[in-house]
Amino acid sequence: MEHLPYAEVWLRSADESAWREASRLARELGKDGLEVWTTDETPEVVSFLEPRGYEIVRRYVVSELDVAAAPEPEPPGVPLTTFALRPDLAEELYEIARESYPDQPGREQSRMASYESWRSWGLDPHPAKAFFIVLDGDRALGYGYLKVDGDQGYHGFTAIARASRGQGLAGAIKRAQIGWAKTNGLSTLRTANEVRLPQMLALNERYGYRPRYTEVVLRGPAA
C-alpha cells in the first residue's frame, strides 16, 4: 500500500484515543488516511467511523476447516509442483501475483511492489513444501500457499493467471493444501475470502469450511 494515502490499522473497539493515535502515526508516515480493519463481532467500530467520513470498501468471510474431520480430498487433477521443487519459477510467480492482486474486489487501485519486496512477504516466509504451483508444461499458471503456526494453517493468497481462470485451478490447489494439512498433522485450516467472490465461498462450503466471522475494512480520513 506504499503508493496509497492510507496506513493500515486494526480497531477492536470504538476507541477515539486509539483512532487519533493511529491517525498521528499515519501522518508521520506521510499518509492522510487510514484503512481500518475490524470484524462484525465489533459493529460499534463501523458506527464510530462512518460519521467521521469512513466507508466500507471490503468484507472478508473467515472460514475454518476441521482438518481431521474433513473427508480425504480428491486428487488435484492437474499438474502441480511446489516451490521447494521449483524455486526457478519465482519470477513467474511474481508476474502472476502482480496481475492478480489488483483484480481482487476493492483492490483495483493497488499496485504490486518490487520483486524483492514481494518475495519478502509473499514467497520466502512461507513453507516451500506447502507452496503449490499449477503447471502447464514448464509454465506456471497459478499458485497458492499455506502459512503455518504450530498445528494451525492459514490459506495465503491464491493467484491464477487471467488467461487460466475458470478452469478449476483454485479448487485443485485447495485440494492439494487440504491433503498436505492432513499429512502434516494440522488441526485446522483458516481462509478469508471477499464476499464478492461467491465462487470461492461456495468452494469452501463444498470442502467443509464453516464461516466463523467477517472482517470489515473501511477507508477514511485521518483525524
Sequence positions of predicted segments:
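Acyl-donor-binding surface of acyltransferase catalytic domains
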Residues: 13-84, 216-220
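Conserved donor-binding loop and adjoining core beta-sheet/short helix segment
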Residues: 1-41, 136-162
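Conserved acetyl-CoA-binding loop-helix of GNAT-fold acetyltransferases
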Residues: 14-28, 160, 166-179, 202, ...
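Conserved active-site tyrosine of GNAT-family acetyltransferases
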Residues: 49, 204, 209
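Conserved GNAT acetyl-CoA-binding A-motif
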Residues: 29-39, 181-193
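Flexible, substrate/cofactor-facing loop regions flanked by secondary structure
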Residues: 76-153
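Polar/charged side chains located within well-ordered beta-strands of beta-rich proteins
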Residues: 63, 97, 155, 174-177, ...
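Glycine-rich acetyl-CoA-binding "A-motif" of GNAT/NAT acetyltransferases
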Residues: 18, 128, 138-142, 199, ...
